[in-house]
């Protein structure tokens, strides 16, 4: 970014270490999962990123899995992420947005996932109750929007080394 005279606005995905109660292959919110900066090092990672040239830290993201059929894991993850937001901002780094991901489930056989509006109402109530309603809030309800509507094509670009295995 600095080479072309720009500032890159970045948001880091953190791993809140929350069990979404979904299949292990589509779980992404537990400590041993492949996605996100570990909860224990998130504050230090944000501090480091905030001091890099050409970087403006603007938000925090998390994703706890896919095909989630309960609201409780989202609320648990939100509490943990808001705890991190407060710890990060206590160091002088301002976060403007909060991105909560995790694919709200769809019915394949006998699943009964909550409706997206019910989930969002509960998340917004918690965000407001904790004093974070002034932030831009992004929700990623995943397959509940597109589960029966398309195909995803991807390419692996990088591998992430983990404590117990590589992803």
PLM feature segments, named:
Residues 66-167:
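C-terminal active-site-proximal or functional interface alpha/beta core segments in diverse enzymes
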Residues 1-106, 112:
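Conserved alpha/beta-domain cores
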